[in-house]
Every structure is written in structure tokens, then in C-alpha cells.
């Protein structure tokens, strides 16, 4: 039995987790660029 509400809830939870992961990665990259060691040979 497929419940559309449960599927929507799982989809929203996955989307929120993905957004949080991307935000944390972006914040880490900005923090690393400002306060971390800046290597000229490091290319993302």
C-alpha cells in the first residue's frame, strides 16, 4: 500500500538533508578559503 503522504514526507526529509549537506559543504569551503591554508595548486 503506497501512502502519498508518507512518500511526500520521505521526499521532503531527503531534500532537507541534501540541502543541509550542500550548505555545510559551502560553509566549510568559504571558511577554508578565508581562514584555512590557501594552496595555489589546490583546484576543486
UniProtKB/Swiss-Prot annotation:
The protein's UniProt keywords, in alphabetical order, are: Early protein
Could you tell me the superkingdom of the organism this chain comes from?
A: Viruses
Pfam families given for it? EPV_E5
InterPro entries assigned? EPV_E5 (IPR012555)
The similarity comment for this entry is: Belongs to the papillomaviridae E5 protein family.
What is this protein's record name?
Answer: Protein E5
